[in-house]
From Swiss-Prot:
It comes from Desulfosudis oleivorans (strain DSM 6200 / JCM 39069 / Hxd3). Residues 529-531 are annotated as: G5. This is Translation initiation factor IF-2. Residues 87-106, 207-223 have a biased composition (Low complexity). Residues 58-248 are annotated as: Disordered. Residues 439-442 are annotated as: G3. Residues 493-496 are annotated as: G4.
Length: 884
């Protein structure tokens, strides 16, 4: 059902918001403010109530002449139909020939002060005798804006209160009394000044006529009474009494024209100023309290807040004009624990703003619009591209050697330890077309690298050694490929080696869902030998056949998009990123966004180091020009202008800062005890520096696995690049050790480390790094002890020896009793004492140990309360070294 707000309904009814709210309150309709909504049935009810003609009995207006130039007008309650006829002669003026034109002074609210009111004067025929002179009351002419017309109050004045007022005859006393209740005099010139139409006849303007009633000629009614419909302002101010008096007319230069002065008494003045100028003080008259101060609300067009992707709590509160504590309270109600300077996202800000009746708009284009992510691709622009193939498998199964044969290169010879510890991208020209290869590490520490390779590829070549079979990292590679939905081609390597069994590989692969085609499955198996260069062409044919089945296409004429394979910080060139272009063409000089960084491409190189001006789809390149070291796996987008790139980068950086703050641990009542226990843990602080960003991630992830309940690894800092002085300073401040992987510190840095007593360790092979850290953590852990019972002896007789105490003559029941070992005294199965065996004798000779079946004398250090029948149990604690 459609709804309408109160301020819209008031506008359609030509009413003010307070008037309509009062009207709704009288009708029993609950409404909090003018921004509240009403249902259609309630709106129709309100419209009928406003426009319905209200017929009320006419009120008698009693006019009495106080003196020759003052007329007092009072409203009297209607008692019966016979009373107007009885009191009609009282309204006639006894002396009409001395009447001058007075000005009717009434309390006018602020809304009516500027209303354009024109009085339509009637000129009746002058009576022949003074007794026939009557006061004719003319109705007020209609005005254009009915909402601004406010007549005086309709409440009748009690005769007891009116009597003292009639006794006042002095104009000066009357003025003084009026000034006592007013804050200032308001002088107003009427638009149409009144004139004396005839001698003895006075025209009095009656403001009691409703604003929406048409002007009608004044009829000579008894006592000057006429019909009147109370307006909305009358009902609002019912219960308040204001005396309306006319003061002495002030003549001006023109003859017959009189100037009117208006006295605004205290009650009217209070209503007009909404309580701001209420009369106070010891001698001030008591004035009834007015309406409460209305809280102003901005217009609908001003109740909009324009923000970007996020905004701080303080800034949001400032733009809405509310207290920040109120915004924080609303966020807490939504389950968001935010501080004053914490950033909230667009959706959270919109929900909070709605609580304060504000609307949130995005100040700039969204990231999807700036990067053109939702643009539909025209199928006619797609062209065939080269397949991207990732080589995966267990460590030392021959992945890089196989790639060397395909590329006719010698990558393996330059690798430390003969293992791949980076992810590489290469483009190879074969007889059947181009193929892009991604070489991933096989060590268990490089899980994240293998996952990125599986997501960025079209086909996976799973290398399995024929003599080794399926290994843990092989299974992990299978899972990564399945998660990415990438087809797998199995290359059974080392078939020339002794003990090779390709059928064993097929059986084990079938157990993991890779069923060979010759066994009725859909997985291609190729037997190869990288060392003997056997089966290489067959493997490439299978890969290209699989690529044709996938129908790989891309649009080279659009803005480039790609993914970061690897990133590093080069000392001479700055941040360098290895990027695989997925679609579009990337050119030197273009502005790109990559993760939280952006920049203009200064140079590009292929996998062999040759410079490039452009790079099309399925092309691996090294690019220089980013503002920082990108994170492996970040997407790269070419942007039309630098301003858009900067906007996207700043928004992403702000999101990352917000996430980093959210990840920081905070103390609460729930986790206070846990935090206190963590302080007792032994923490090993580490700073990791490596040649590429992927190695930093791999090392950090591998070391975090060693954290346990007693020892914990805290990575203080991790970044690609060489070890510099700031790393040593940070390590000294945080009591950390510096681990370098494929990087070396300079002599100056080594001297600073020696001065600051900072331990710097450099490694080329990740095995050695992980083993050293594991040993260090093991040494930090406390050993545990396990109790082992040696033997038990029963006490049968007691001997008291001076200077040595009580000696228990005992019989060894089982095991053996050794001197100096811990022992416990058991009495009726309950431990009576824990101590150490101080003396052990057999036949008056000291003995080191006594075996079972023999008698001996046992003395317990510092304990003599031994009784016959007790059992002495001898044991020792075995130390168990901790393991990770």
């Amino acid at each position: 059902m459609a709804k309408i707000r109160i301020f819209e309904l008031a506008r359609s009814l030509n009413m003010t918001n307070p008037d309509l709210l009062d009207r709704l309150k009288e009708m029993g309709i609950e409404a909090k403010s003018h921004l509240s909504s009403l249902e259609d049935d309630i709106v129709e009810k309100v419209r009928q109530g406003v426009f319905r003609t209200e017929v009320e009995k006419p009120e008698k207006v009693e006019q009495k002449r106080v003196r020759s130039n003052v007329i007092r007008k009072r409203r009297q309650p209607v008692k019966s139909e016979a009373e107007p006829e009885a009191e009609a002669p009282a309204a006639q003026a006894p002396e009409a020939e001395e009447v001058t034109a007075p000005t009717a002074e009434e309390a006018v609210p602020e809304e009516a002060a500027d209303a354009d009111v024109s009085a339509k004067a009637e000129t009746p025929t002058a009576p022949e005798t003074p007794e026939e002179a009557e006061i004719s009351v003319s109705e007020e002419a209609p005005v254009e804006e009915a909402a601004d017309q406010v007549p005086p109050t309709d409440e009748a004045v009690d005769p007891a209160e009116a009597a003292p007022a009639e006794e006042e005859s002095s104009p000066s006393r009357k003025k003084a009394k009026a000034k006592k209740h007013q804050a200032a005099k308001i002088i107003k010139f009427p638009d149409a000044p009144q004139r004396l139409s005839n001698k003895g006849v006075l025209e009095v303007v009656d403001d009691t006529a409703p604003a929406d009633s048409p002007a009608a000629p004044a009829a000579a009614t008894p006592a000057g009474e006429k019909d009147k419909k109370p307006s909305r302002k009358d009902r609002k101010k019912r219960g308040k009494t204001e005396s309306v008096e006319t003061e002495e007319a002030v003549p001006v230069k023109k003859k017959g024209v009189f100037k009117r002065k208006e006295i605004v008494e205290g009650v009217a003045l209070y209503d007009r100023t909404r309580g701001r100028m209420r009369k106070k003080g010891k001698g001030g008259a008591k004035v009834p309290g007015g309406a409460k101060t209305q809280i102003t609300t901005p217009k609908a067009i001003k109740r909009k807040v324009r923000i970007n992707e996020s905004i701080s709590v303080a800034e949001l509160a400032k733009r809405m004009g509310v207290k920040a504590s109120e915004v924080i309270a609303r966020l807490m109600g939504m389950g968001v624990m935010a501080t004053l300077n914490q950033q909230v996202d667009f959706d959270s800000a919109a929900l909070v703003a709605a609580e304060f009746e504000y609307e949130v708009e995005k100040a700039s284009a969204t990231e999807e619009e700036l990067l053109e992510l939702n643009v539909e691709e025209d199928q006619g622009n797609l062209k065939k591209r080269a397949p991207v193939v990732t080589i995966m498998g267990h460590v030392d199964h021959g992945k890089t050697s196989l790639l060397d044969v395909i590329r006719q290169s010698r990558i393996t010879e330059g690798e430390a330890g003969g293992i791949t510890q980076h992810i590489g991208a290469y483009k190879v020209n074969t007889a059947n077309g181009e193929v892009v290869f991604l070489d991933t590490p096989g060590h268990e520490a490089f899980t994240a690298m293998r996952a990125r390779g599986a997501r960025a590829t079209d086909i996976v070549i799973l290398v399995v050694a024929a003599d080794d079979g399926i290994m843990p990292q092989t299974i992990e590679a299978i899972n990564h490929s399945r998660a990415a939905g990438v087809p797998i081609v199995v290359a059974v390597n080392k078939i020339d080696k002794e003990g090779a069994d390709p059928d064993r590989v097929k059986r084990e692969a079938s157990d993991h869902g890779l069923v060979p085609e010759d066994w009725g499955g859909d997985t291609m198996f190729v037997n190869v030998s990288a060392k003997q260069k056997l089966g290489i062409s067959d493997l490439l044919d299978m890969v290209l056949l699989q690529a044709e089945m996938l129908e790989l296409k891309a649009n080279p004429d659009k803005k480039a998009r790609g993914v970061v394979i690897e990133a590093k910080l080069d000392p001479g060139r700055g941040p360098v990123a290895t990027v695989l272009i997925h679609e579009g063409t990337l050119s030197v000089g273009e502005t790109v966004v990559c993760g939280i960084h952006y920049g203009k491409i200064r140079a590009m190189f292929d996998d062999k180091g040759a410079p490039l001006d452009q790079a099309g789809p399925a092309t691996p390149v090294e690019l220089i020009g980013l503002g920082g070291v990108a994170t492996s796996g970040d997407d790269l987008f070419a942007v039309g202008d630098e301003k858009s790139a900067k906007t996207v980068s700043e928004n992403r950086q702000q999101k990352q800062r917000t996430e980093d703050l959210a990840r920081k641990d905070s103390i609460s009542l729930e986790n206070f005890f846990e935090k206190m226990q963590e302080k007792e843990e032994k923490v090993l602080n580490i700073i990791i520096k490596a040649d590429v960003n992927g190695s930093c991630e791999a090392i950090a992830d591998s070391l975090q696995k060693f954290s346990s309940g007693e020892v914990k690894i805290h990575v203080v800092h991790s970044a690609p690049g060489t070890i510099i002085e700031s790393d040593v300073t940070l390590a000294s401040a945080s009591n950390a050790i510096v681990l370098g992987f494929n990087v070396r510190p300079s002599p100056k840095v080594r001297a600073l480390a020696a001065e600051e007593n900072v331990d710097i360790r450099s490694y080329d092979i990740i095995y050695d790094l992980i083993d050293d850290i594991k040993k260090a953590l093991t040494g930090m852990m406390s050993s545990t002890f396990e109790e082992e019972v040696l033997g038990r002896a029963e006490v049968r007789e007691l001997f008291v020896i001076p200077k040595k105490g009580t000696i228990a003559g005992s019989y060894v029941l089982d095991g053996k009793i050794e001197r100096g070992r811990p022992a416990r005294l058991l009495r009726d199965g309950v431990i009576a004492y824990n101590g150490v065996i101080g003396s052990l004798r057999r036949h008056k000779d000291d003995a080191k140990e006594v075996a079972s079946g023999y008698e001996c004398g046992i003395g317990i250090e510092n304990y003599n309360d031994i009784k016959p029948g007790d059992v002495i149990e001898c044991y020792f604690l075995r130390e168990i070294k901790p393991e990770l």
